[in-house]
Amino acid sequence: MTPPTHHLLILSDSHGHTRNLRDILARQVHRPEAILFLGDGLRDLGSLGLAEKGIDLIAVQGNCDGYSATDEPTERMLFVGNVKICMMHGHTRHVKSGWTVAAAHAAREGADLLLFGHTHDAMEEYLPAGTMLGGVPLEKPLTVFNPGTVGGGWGKDASFGTLTVQGDTFLCGHGKI
């Protein structure tokens, strides 16, 4: 039997740009079952009516979310299908100086996929098993993914990420607004 397919949106750093959030949701071919929000704009999500649309929200707090009176953690681990995901904004792992510290943490936690924001730079990197990370070889592959910034600005195009999971396989993608 084929495992179910999960379609998710990966969003980060909206910084008040709720119109961009609505535009991203409207553009999706598959209604996402969840939004994975990587911080800096938690307050913005309230205007989307996600519960009424049947879309779950899984979020972490960013460095600019302190004003939001949120109890979301700065990092979390979760499974989608059989894929273990490490979510973080990244400021506590200093990702603006590079993502290797965050990736080493995700690898120690047994993650298959690291999702982070904060830098506003959309990127994806696949690290095969055996790759040296922090002086230690990876025991299994790790994909490192940043969706960029929903808000745009700071010299960056507004962007988002998608994640499709089936069993223990997954595919990440980037989109621009």
Question: Model-flagged regions — what are they?
Answer:
Residues 1, 74-82, 124-138:
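Short acidic-hydrophobic surface loop/beta-edge motif
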Residues 1-54, 65, 72-73, 156-159, ...:
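N-terminal active-site segment of His-dependent metallophosphoesterases
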Residues 2-5, 23, 104-110, 133-177:
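Binuclear metal-dependent phosphoesterase catalytic core
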Residues 10-12, 34-40, 58-63, 86-89, ...:
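Active-site neighborhood of phospho(di)ester-bond hydrolases with catalytic His/Asp-centered motifs
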Residues 15-19, 42-46, 64-69, 93-98, ...:
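Active-site environment of divalent metal-dependent phosphoester hydrolases
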Residues 29-30, 50-54, 80, 106-109, ...:
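Short, conserved loop/helix-junction motifs that constitute active-site signature segments
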Residues 54-56, 82-84, 141-142, 169:
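A generic structural signal for alpha->beta connector loops
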Residues 56-97, 101-104, 108:
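Helix-adjacent hinge/juxtasegments
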